[in-house]
């Protein structure tokens, strides 16, 4: 079991190596719009999970995630070799590529928060000129409340 700090440093280094290799060495056009977002390394330093996102060519175009996954799978050997050459460790970790769903989840949460804000504004508009039903102070009070303690006890 390796030190957690060492595993974190190695994971960050693997992320950098994989991203640079995809950008400069891998000759697959399907990987042009792939971004490496994170890497996690197991405690024994033998397996690395590389998280990635895929953008569309335009803002309106849906990204081709299946083609990117296939291209990463095909380039896995070249990427692992680059990691082994540049990392300088005895055992080069195996690379597993996983689509990062954080951007989609984040966008969905932003959408839900915007809907909640809109509903809150509607409630605030409806409550703007309203008066409370009943008394201004709806809580029951005892007849002794508000008087000094010596008078309240009857002494």
From Swiss-Prot:
GO terms for molecular function: ribosomal small subunit binding. It comes from the Bacteria. Pfam families: RBFA. Keywords: Cytoplasm, Ribosome biogenesis. One of its GO terms (biological process) is maturation of SSU-rRNA. One of its GO terms (cellular component) is cytosol. Gene3D superfamilies: 3.30.300.20. InterPro entries: KH_dom-like_a/b, RbfA, RbfA_dom_sf, Ribosome-bd_factorA_CS. Residues 116-125, 142-155 have a biased composition (Basic and acidic residues). It is found in: Cytoplasm. Residues 116-155 are annotated as: Disordered. Belongs to the RbfA family. Monomer. Binds 30S ribosomal subunits, but not 50S ribosomal subunits or 70S ribosomes. One of several proteins that assist in the late maturation steps of the functional core of the 30S ribosomal subunit. Associates with free 30S ribosomal subunits (but not with 30S subunits that are part of 70S ribosomes or polysomes). Required for efficient processing of 16S rRNA. May interact with the 5'-terminal helix region of 16S rRNA. PANTHER family: RIBOSOME-BINDING FACTOR A, CHLOROPLASTIC-RELATED. This is Ribosome-binding factor A. It comes from Corynebacterium kroppenstedtii (strain DSM 44385 / JCM 11950 / CIP 105744 / CCUG 35717). The lineage of its organism: Bacteria, Bacillati, Actinomycetota, Actinomycetes, Mycobacteriales. The gene is rbfA.
